């Protein structure tokens, strides 16, 4: 139970959602930023694939001088997450139901320049089969959308418990000239953020590795 939040009915959802299915091909409408946040000109942290949204829910409380936007393709989870946010009275947090692979441009194009300063993509669906690789969230087009709107000096934090997923995500960002990898090692040993995701905590408690990397918007 999250402190200050009354119990909500548990929402059961499909673990895997095909982002190429017809129902997910319509891009999200632009946000009315002034209605979504009490202080819309604070720096924005975008969490792509936020699931139940617990990570950004905690981040919004730890970093009240930032705004947080969680994107999730499973609508029932977004409804639940926004209920939690409302119960806590957080005005620097918003969740949006959308397919990130076709919605970043219409969402972020209305942001003032320099507002988007941090992006996280954590433990995305691995889509193990090669024929399903196009369903993985980190595609070259998504990387370019992030490059178009992330402030120079802004960062992208990636992590997964599947090494092949982490490698593919890193390869996609490394292939874009707008990004440079931070650090000299292949993987970060520590999470640079003050909050861990539930999946991260569970994985580490089992003694299993988490593959992390940080990229900076360089030009």
UniProtKB/Swiss-Prot annotation:
Entry annotated with the keyword S-adenosyl-L-methionine: yes
Residues binding S-adenosyl-L-methionine? 47, 72, 99, 125
- Give the E.C. number(s): 2.1.1.33
Q: Name one GO molecular function term.
A: tRNA (guanine(46)-N7)-methyltransferase activity
The keyword Cell inner membrane is assigned to this record:
no
* Residues binding substrate: 129, 161
Q: Which UniProt keywords apply?
A: Methyltransferase, S-adenosyl-L-methionine, Transferase, tRNA processing
Q: Which NCBIfam families match?
A: tRNA (guanosine(46)-N7)-methyltransferase TrmB
Q: State the protein's purpose.
A: Catalyzes the formation of N(7)-methylguanine at position 46 (m7G46) in tRNA.
Q: What is this protein called?
A: tRNA (guanine-N(7)-)-methyltransferase
